[in-house]
Amino acid sequence: MSCAWPAEFSAQTDNIAFPDAAETYFLQQIVASAGTRIVLSGLFPDARYASIQVYTPSGVGASLPDYRIAPQPGSLNPWRQQAAPGGRFTVTIRSDPAPGQANTLPMPAGTTSQHPGYLMYRVYLPAGGGGLSAVPVPVLTVEQGGSARTLPACSSHNAPVHPPAVSGSAASAGAGGSGAAAPPPRQLEFFKPPQSTFNNGGLANVDTSYVLAY
């Protein structure tokens, strides 16, 4: 990892992903050895939804959605209580997170240059539009072997992205066009669709059901 956030894509550039036409994604490939940590230092954005998600080389994801990110002392999380955006947070990606540890995500295991893991910062419906000019992306610091290195911002953000494909039953369950969709339950105002409705491989949003209910 030589620089931070080499890939950015949104409806204005790639016109992909779900469920918001006003989404912005920032992507970082991860190739990390044992003991490496990645620390994200960021600001809560003015947006409908935001999350930090990591994926293994096979596409299995873990997420910290907006409301679960604890603010730094003296800051407030606007998804937890009424507050202006701009509060500070710190999130750590590490290989040995304790169960229930706040602001921590698991480091993708088994990453190589040919099969990297992925770090994604998702922001839906940011005020003022998407892109780096409107969304304050977190600063990335790599900690390894007792030293810390803050990654400089990439000079461009159009690096090619080749998301992993979900294989086996997960891929077949999420693939569209192979049969009729199951009807929703009757006499219910709200129901939770199966995750396979949305997960068609690649870097699927772990928080899709939460976003739809928000």
Language-model features, listed with the residues they occupy:
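A compositional/structural signature for long, glycine/proline-rich flexible linkers
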Residues: 1-214
